[in-house]
């Protein structure tokens, strides 16, 4: 029987999931997105050519791989079409490889307008959303007024539903946020214009995955964002609007949780965060600047500068706990090359001297803690492009071993550069 593997981020996103998914899809027959939307940014570098995907699964560049967008993903038709056209322009036969659940909620222009208006109204309390309508679209889903891809296939009914929901949202835009209303007719026309095209790619995702599983075909589930941004388990309210954890696979694709064989947690050798929110190990100094510049830490979706910091083992233990991580992939180890010392956060200390090895459950709790660091020797030698453990300097190996001890979880894959071949697979998740 084939294995079913989940690849997800264990930090605040931007861990390097896209490259690892692309690498592992060589062994998969299906690659499935199960949450998030085009707020994700997965960067692939193949033979020096860079491709950034926001909505379509990273396996789309592989022959003989079916890419699936599950029901847990919110889909902006314009963003989807832009990505499809970009890939087709590069000669990728998207229609032959991509399948979509018709239960996916739609992101429409009024969702984006609401997202932007809310962030502006929050002022200094802004969450740091991408402004792409993700949160408002999930709100509509939960409130049971949302429109789904399947609604597009009945034009008359879609028009009626759209009119009702737009009355509600345009009232909020004009009367509360004091901004312009979104045009109903334009929204309707634009959505219906691609209905037939989308219909040709729609399928019953849960049924398809069940058939594939029973046939022994390996399936890879591609997470977006990261564990610490999970709507329930992240640094609330500075979180995304979906379940970014392994539990999201079942709800976002209809694949039974008992059939998952391996959870691969992607973890950078340091930590970054983009946008607002607590970050105990943040480095607002020269070392942080060094890491940020060397790691080219700019958001793939927004281009915003990411906030760098030391690796937080306390937060990573929480990620292991929530996701039942089988093994880690450590990425961007080479970014730490040249540092005299590297630090790992091993605990949090409160003002009264109390030490905790557990993360707070809400964002406010992080204001009360100071990170406790364990300092290790750095290394001057390069790790860039290393493909065997023996090629790594002893100090880098010790750093890896210490992380395994602290997290009580093996590091099964190590990434030492952006390209596919700059990777060492110590344990193959599919074997």
Swiss-Prot record:
What are the catalytic residues? 14, 42
One Gene Ontology BP term is: 'de novo' AMP biosynthetic process
GO MF term set? adenylosuccinate synthase activity; GTP binding; magnesium ion binding
In Pfam terms, one family for this protein is Adenylsucc_synt
Residues binding Mg(2+) are 14, 41
Give the record's pathway.
Purine metabolism; AMP biosynthesis via de novo pathway; AMP from IMP: step 1/2
Q: Which cofactor does it need?
A: Mg(2+)
For binding GTP, which residues are annotated in this chain's numbering? 13-19, 41-43, 306, 332-334, 415-417
Q: What is its EC number?
A: 6.3.4.4
Q: In which domain of life is the source organism classified?
A: Bacteria
Q: What is its main location?
A: cytoplasm
User: What is annotated about its quaternary structure and interactions?
Assistant: Homodimer.
Q: What is this protein called?
A: Adenylosuccinate synthetase
Name its species: Shewanella frigidimarina (strain NCIMB 400)
């Amino acid at each position: 029987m084939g294995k079913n593997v989940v690849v997800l981020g264990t930090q605040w996103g931007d861990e390097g999931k896209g490259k690892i998914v692309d690498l592992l899809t060589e062994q998969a027959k299906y690659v499935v997105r199960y949450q998030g939307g085009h707020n994700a940014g997965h960067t692939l570098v193949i033979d020096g050519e860079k491709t950034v995907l926001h909505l379509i699964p990273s396996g789309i560049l592989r022959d003989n791989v079916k890419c699936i967008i599950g029901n847990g993903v919110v889909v902006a038709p314009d963003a989807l079409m832009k990505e499809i056209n970009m890939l087709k322009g590069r000669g990728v036969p998207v229609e032959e490889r991509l399948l979509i659940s018709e239960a996916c909620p739609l992101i429409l222009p009024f969702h984006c307008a609401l997202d932007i208006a809310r962030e502006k109204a929050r002022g200094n309390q802004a969450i740091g959303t991408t402004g792409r309508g993700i949160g408002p679209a999930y709100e509509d889903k939960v409130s049971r007024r949302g429109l789904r891809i399947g609604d597009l296939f009945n034009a008359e009914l879609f028009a009626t539903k759209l009119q009702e929901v737009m009355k509600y949202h345009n009232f909020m835009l004009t009367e509360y946020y004091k901004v312009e209303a979104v045009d109903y007719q334009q929204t309707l026309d634009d959505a219906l214009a691609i209905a037939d095209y989308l219909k040709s790619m729609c399928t019953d995702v849960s049924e398809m995955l069940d058939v594939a599983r029973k046939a022994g075909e390996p399936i890879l589930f591609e997470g977006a964002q990261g564990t610490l941004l999970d709507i329930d388990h992240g640094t609330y309210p500075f979180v995304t609007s979906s379940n970014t954890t392994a539990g999201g696979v079942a709800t976002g694709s209809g694949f039974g949780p008992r059939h998952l064989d391996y959870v691969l947690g992607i973890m950078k050798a340091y930590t970054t965060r983009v946008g607002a929110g607590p970050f105990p190990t943040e480095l607002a100094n020269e070392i942080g600047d060094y890491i940020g510049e060397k790691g080219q830490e700019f958001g793939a979706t927004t281009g915003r500068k990411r906030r760098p910091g030391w690796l937080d083992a306390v937060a990573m233990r929480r990620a292991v706990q929530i996701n039942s991580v089988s093994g880690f992939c450590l990425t961007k180890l080479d970014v730490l090359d040249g540092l005299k010392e590297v630090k790992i956060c091993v605990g949090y200390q409160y003002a009264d001297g109390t030490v905790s090895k557990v993360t707070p459950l809400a964002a406010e709790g992080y204001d009360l803690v100071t990170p406790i660091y364990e300092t290790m020797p750095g290394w001057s030698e390069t790790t860039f492009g290393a493909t065997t453990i023996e090629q790594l300097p002893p100090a880098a190996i010790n750093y890896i071993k210490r992380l395994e001890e602290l997290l009580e979880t093996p590091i099964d894959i190590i990434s030492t550069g952006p390209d596919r071949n700059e990777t060492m697979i110590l344990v193959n998740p599919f074997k």
